[in-house]
C-alpha cells in the first residue's frame, strides 16, 4: 500500500517551506551511513496519529503568462493531481489576495480534500484575522504559525481525516510485484513493452491502488508477475517528466508497492546525480534491486567498455554493491531474456530465512576471525542473533551495549552473511539490541 500524499500549495512567500520543514522535522536528514544515498529535500516523509504519509512542497503558484509562471503553475497542478489531501497555505497578516482567490479556484476544480492553513497567526490576539478567509470557500480556516510551530497538530488532524482507507494490493502473496524507476528518457516504457512482447504472455491491465495507476499482470514459466503503475510510465507529459520532484513522487508510490525494483539507467548518457537519488529511494525502502543499463546497443564499445561501465556503477552506487547489473536493449531485445530470471532470483533472496542455529554458528566464526570492537576499554559482546523478518532480511543482534556496534563492524557482519548465503539483490538490515530488551 502506498502512503497517502499531502501537497502543500499556495502563492509565493506565505511560508510553505517552513510548514513543510515543521511537518517532516528531522526526517529530512539523511540517516543512511553509506556514501551515495541522497534525498531530494523538496519531498519527504511524515507521521501523525500513527499514520505515515508523504509530503511535497510545490513551490509558489503565481498567476501570469510568463513562461516561468506558467510552468510553475503546471507543476503545482501535477502535484495536486497526485495528492490525496492538499494543505492550502495563506498569509494571515496580509489577508485574502487576488492570487489566493485564483489558487482557491484551482483547488475547487480539483475536487480534492483541502485543508486551509492561515499562517503567521503568531498570537491569540490575531484570531480575528481568520474570518476573512471564509470567503475563499475552502472551509474552516485553521490558525497556524510555522515560525513558532503553533497549530500544526490541528492542521495534521484535519489531513488524516481525509486519508484514504488503508487497503493493501489484492495480489496473491506468490506474485512478484515489479516497478521500473529511473529519470526521464532512460527507456522505462520501452522496456516494459519489450518485456511483455518478448515473453508472449497473457497480459491484463488492473487498476492499482494508487489513483489512476494501472498495473500489468502476466505470467512466465509458472511464475505470476505484476508490473506496477505501467500507466504512470506511459502517460507523463513533458512538464511532468522535466520536473524531477514529481517524477520522483510517482516513482516512490511505485516503489512502496513493489517487491523488486529495476533501477533503469541510460547506457548512452552514463550516470548522473539524479540516477543516484532515485536509486537511493529504492534502497531506503528495503526493496530488492536490479540495476538495468538500457540502450546498450547504442553505446560504442571496445573490449573494455563493459568493465569500465560496471566499475563506474560500483563507484557511483556504493550503497547498491549488492545489486546485480544487467546490460540490455529494449530496442533490439538484447539480453532481455535475463531480466525475469534475475527478478525471480533476487525476490527469492529478498525472502530468504536463515535457521537460527546456523546464524549463530556463523557469527561465532566471524567473531573468532575478527574480534568485536572496544570503546574506552569496553568490548562489544554478541550474545546471540536471530532473523526477525524477510523482505528485506532483518537480523537482530542481542548485545551487551548497542552503542558498541560500530558501523564498520556491522558492515563486516553483513559481508560475512553475504559471503555465506544467497543475498544478491537484497539489502540486509542489522539491528543491535540490548540483551534485556
From Swiss-Prot:
Annotated ranges, domain KH-like: 352-436
Binding residues annotated for GTP 1, in chain numbering: 10-17, 57-61, 119-122
Keyword line: GTP-binding, Nucleotide-binding, Repeat, Ribosome biogenesis
SUPFAM superfamilies xref list: P-loop containing nucleoside triphosphate hydrolases
Pfam families: KH_dom-like, MMR_HSR1
GO molecular function: GTP binding; ribosome binding
Name this protein carries in UniProt: GTPase Der
Amino acid at each position: 500500500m502506498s502512503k497517502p500524499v499531502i501537497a502543500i500549495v499556495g502563492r509565493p512567500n506565505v511560508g510553505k517551506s517552513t510548514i513543510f520543514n515543521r511537518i517532516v522535522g528531522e526526517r529530512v536528514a539523511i540517516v543512511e551511513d553509506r556514501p551515495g544515498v541522497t534525498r531530494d529535500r523538496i519531498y519527504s516523509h511524515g507521521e501523525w496519529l500513527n499514520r505515515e504519509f508523504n509530503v511535497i512542497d510545490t513551490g509558489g503558484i503565481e498567476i501570469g503568462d510568463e513562461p516561468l509562471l506558467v510552468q510553475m503553475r503546471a507543476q503545482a497542478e501535477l502535484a495536486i493531481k497526485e495528492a490525496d489531501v492538499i494543505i492550502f497555505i495563506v498569509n494571515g497578516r496580509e489577508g485574502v489576495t487576488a492570487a489566493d482567490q485564483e489558487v482557491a479556484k484551482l483547488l475547487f476544480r480539483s475536487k480534492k480534500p483541502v485543508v486551509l492553513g492561515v499562517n503567521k497567526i503568531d498570537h491569540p490576539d490575531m484570531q480575528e484575522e481568520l474570518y476573512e478567509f471564509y470567503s475563499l470557500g475552502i472551509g474552516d480556516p485553521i490558525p497556524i504559525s510555522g515560525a513558532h510551530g503553533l497549530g500544526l497538530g490541528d492542521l495534521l488532524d484535519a489531513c488524516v481525516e481525509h486519508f484514504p482507507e488503508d487497503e493493501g494490493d489484492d495480489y496473491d502473496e506468490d506474485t512478484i510485484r515489479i516497478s521500473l524507476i529511473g529519470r526521464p528518457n532512460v527507456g522505462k516504457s520501452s522496456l516494459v513493452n519489450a518485456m511483455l512482447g518478448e515473453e508472449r504472455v497473457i497480459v491484463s491491465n488492473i487498476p492499482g491502488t494508487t489513483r489512476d495507476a494501472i498495473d500489468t499482470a502476466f505470467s512466465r514459466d509458472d511464475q505470476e508477475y505484476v508490473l506496477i503503475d505501467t500507466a504512470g510510465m506511459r502517460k507523463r507529459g513533458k512538464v511532468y517528466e522535466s520536473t524531477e520532484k514529481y517524477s520522483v513522487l510517482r516513482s516512490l508510490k511505485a516503489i512502496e508497492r513493489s517487491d523488486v525494483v529495476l533501477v533503469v539507467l541510460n547506457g548512452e548518457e552514463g550516470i548522473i546525480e539524479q540516477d543516484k537519488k532515485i536509486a537511493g529511494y529504492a534502497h531506503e525502502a528495503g526493496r530488492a534491486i536490479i540495476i538495468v543499463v538500457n540502450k546498450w546497443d547504442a553505446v560504442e564499445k571496445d573490449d573494455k567498455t563493459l568493465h569500465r561501465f560496471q566499475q563506474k556503477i560500483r563507484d557511483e552506487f556504493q550503497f547498491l554493491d549488492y545489486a546485480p547489473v544487467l546490460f540490455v536493449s529494449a530496442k533490439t531485445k538484447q539480453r532481455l531474456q535475463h531480466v525475469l530470471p534475475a527478478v525471480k532470483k533476487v525476490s527469492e533472496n529478498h525472502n530468504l530465512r536463515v535457521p537460527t542455529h546456523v546464524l549463530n554458528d556463523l557469527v561465532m566464526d566471524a567473531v573468532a576471525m575478527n574480534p568485536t570492537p572496544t570503546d574506552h576499554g569496553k568490548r562489544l559482546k554478541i550474545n546471540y542473533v536471530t532473523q526477525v523478518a524477510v523482505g528485506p532480511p532483518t537480523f537482530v543482534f542481542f548485545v551487551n551495549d548497542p552503542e558498541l556496534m560500530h558501523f564498520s563492524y556491522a558492515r563486516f557482519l553483513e559481508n560475512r552473511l553475504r559471503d555465506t548465503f544467497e543475498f544478491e539483490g537484497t539489502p540486509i538490515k542489522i539491528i543491535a539490541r540490548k540483551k534485556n530488551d
